[in-house]
Design a protein with these regions (language model features):
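Acidic/polar loop patches that form or flank catalytic/metal-binding clefts of enzymes
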Residues: 9-10, 99, 130, 195, ...
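Glycine-rich beta-alpha loop elements in corrinoid/cobalamin-binding modules
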Residues: 1-26, 228, 232, 236
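Radical SAM enzyme core and accessory elements
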Residues: 19-20, 237-313
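Short, hinge-like loop/turn segments at secondary-structure boundaries
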Residues: 4-7, 174-175, 213-215, 243-247
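Flexible glycine/acidic-rich beta-alpha junction loops that bind and position SAM and/or redox cofactors
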Residues: 62, 113, 166, 170-171, ...
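Conserved ATP/PPi-binding loop(s) of AMP-dependent carboxylate-activating enzymes
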Residues: 26-38
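Short, electropositive alpha-helical surface patch
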Residues: 116-122, 206-223
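Radical SAM [4Fe-4S] cluster-binding motif and immediate context
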Residues: 35-195, 200, 215
């Protein structure tokens, strides 16, 4: 090995020493892997979950304070071959009769050139499948939305986190509430179902900011909001550093046991009452409406995300 050839551990790329020094050299990544569904699992998941999942890209260049993706997948974005993705979809349709696919990229609309090429490939190969993905409210225009819709896009799950600009800045987001409104309108105009996933009471999300988020939700049309309280603290994130400074966690805490950051003035019941008073579709994790999805999935054989049935004008 490297040591037998006289190389020290500090000379080996991506190797860490006990004192925290990392190996030198250029970081390397695995080449694009073969995209293929596992035959023994495909039928089970299609029946039970109503969709299959596939990844089109790995890596995330964003700076969200709570997110572990950059440290797990790297910050360099690597994409899969669109032809291989299309071929795999066609094979799954033929062998299992699937009609819905969810692209599990951390953020789908990173790299517009690649996404356009992927959508054009899906159209050219006539995959004729409905699909959804996680989107950022920033980085999509009307032309792209129309193309994605033509390629089968039916559901967008926006990682919005807040409808308050001050909180978005504190969370390390690269978009504003204005971007959220524009992206929502683009989806609505093209007939694409969309939902907003929110983190309330996270780092920097004050009581006043939460109230602004709830009030701004009145401006969202034909959608559903899924709010979550606080942030899970993961190692190697900015949130972990901030939480340690505030004494919320120890500096040597390995965070193997789940730890969460929740603003001191966050009141879940107050938030719940204010959200429901808007008349909009706010679905909290313990909401009885969540059981509707199980009923539709198992008893009526509905496919794809089922939150579209929870939307309100």
């Amino acid at each position: 090995g490297a040591l037998e050839r006289g190389r020290t551990e500090i000379d080996i790329p991506s190797v860490y020493t006990r004192d925290g020094r990392r190996g030198s050299g250029r970081r390397s990544y695995l080449p694009s892997i073969e995209v293929q569904f596992e035959p023994e699992l495909t039928g089970y998941y299609w029946k039970r979950s109503g969709m299959l999942n596939i990844q089109t890209k790995r890596g995330c260049p964003y700076d969200c304070i709570y997110c572990s993706y950059p440290s797990i997948d790297g910050r360099c974005v690597r994409t899969m071959d669109p032809e291989a993705i299309a071929e795999n979809i066609l094979r799954a349709k033929r062998d299992y009769g699937i009609s819905y696919l969810f692209f599990t990229d951390s953020v789908f609309n990173i790299g517009p050139e690649y996404n356009v090429r992927l959508a054009e490939t899906l159209i050219r190969r006539r995959t004729d499948i409905r699909w959804g993905a996680y989107f950022s409210p920033r980085g999509i225009d009307a032309e792209q939305m129309r193309l994605f819709r033509a390629s089968g896009l039916t559901h967008i799950e926006f990682g919005t986190e807040s409808f308050c600009d001050r909180t978005l800045e504190a969370y390390g987001k690269r978009f504003t509430f204005g971007d959220v409104e524009r992206a929502s309108r683009l989806a609505l105009d093209e007939g694409v179902y969309y939902a907003h996933f929110l983190i309330l009471g996270g780092y920097g999300d004050t009581r006043e900011n939460v109230r602004e988020t709830i009030e701004n939700s009145r401006r969202m049309e034909y959608t559903v909001m899924f709010p979550y309280a606080g942030m899970r603290i993961y190692p190697h994130t900015r949130l972990a550093e901030l939480a340690a400074k505030e004494g919320a966690i120890g500096r040597d805490d390995d965070l193997m046991a789940p730890s969460y950051y929740i603003s001191r003035d966050f009141d879940l019941e107050e938030v719940r009452r204010a959200a429901l008073a808007t008349g909009k579709a706010w679905v909290f994790p313990d909401d009885p409406q969540s059981a509707l999805a199980d009923t539709l999935r198992l008893k009526r054989n509905k496919k794809g995300p089922l939150w579209e049935y929870l939307r309100k004008p």
